Regions:
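Acidic, two-metal ion nucleic-acid-processing modules in DNA metabolism proteins
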Residues: 1-107
Length: 107
């Protein structure tokens, strides 16, 4: 370990990563298949988007998902606009989804 490098706590490191992700991936368009979809009583939706090469967790908060017009189901092909974020307490990278539509519907 280099002596000139500061020793970070896990929380400090996660916050730094979260900040970097938020700056670098402020807006992304992503397509994929919905899996593990769950709508909670709070109104928030939690799901994963996946393709043949990987998957990423997603959250869509109530204020945004009220504008979607349909309830996604596992297996749906969708396109989302989102920002990349990290849930700092667990170190999980996720998409915070701002809009969602069925894939191939145009815009």
């Amino acid at each position: 370990m280099e002596k000139s490098s500061p020793v970070l706590t896990v929380g400090d490191l996660n916050r730094a990563i979260a900040e970097s992700l938020a700056e670098q991936f402020e807006f992304v368009l992503v397509s994929g298949e919905v899996s593990n979809f769950k709508a909670y009583d709070s109104g928030h939706w939690y799901f994963s988007l996946k393709d043949e090469e990987g998957q990423i967790r997603c959250v869509m908060f109530r204020g945004k998902n009220l504008q979607v017009g349909f309830m996604p189901q596992s297996g749906d092909q969708v396109e989302v606009s989102a920002s990349v974020s990290m849930y700092v307490p667990r170190g999980d990278v996720q998409l915070t989804v701002h809009s969602l539509r069925k894939a191939g519907l145009g815009g």
